Amino acid sequence: VMHTSLGECIRNNKMLPSFRARFCTRQIKIEPARKRMAALAAQGEVNHYVGLRADEETRLGGIFDDIGIVNRHPFREWGWGVNEVWQCLQRHGLAERIPERTDCDVCYHQQIGEWWRLWTNHLDRWMRGENLEIEVGGTFRTPGRDTWPTSMRELREAFESGRIPKSERQPELFSRGTMTGGACRVCSL
């Protein structure tokens, strides 16, 4: 089953994605990509360029050889790690525009600072996530991951009461100077 939106995917599965149920990645990213690449492969050879770095040896990234797709890993071929990739992005004026991660805006992998920036900069998206939690029953955030509330409603209430994540009060301690510099990853796409 392929879906066009996270909300549709969640409603169809009648549950929120979590580290134990990563159906969203498969149904929103992998299956549509496989379908498109299979159609391309039917027309001839397809090279699939994957942005995994040389310092990410254990990650495979998109294995499509069963449908005739050739995976290419240029960063690995060049021996580039995270520093070389960011240096290249800086040389081309792109470093400030690239988010640290490109997951969904209500992904269970988010860190508390990312939740804060979503609430601060994109309240409409926040509320869409909060409503999905209520509709399906459950939370996007993993219980016990940190000392913050788990549900988006309770987390919003904590933010509204003035509680601010340490990463947002002292960004110089938590950002990679070369990354998004504390900018909202949704805004920087």
Segments predicted by a language model, with ranges:
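Nucleotide-activated chemistry modules centered on ATP-dependent adenylation/adenylyltransferase
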Residues: 1-189
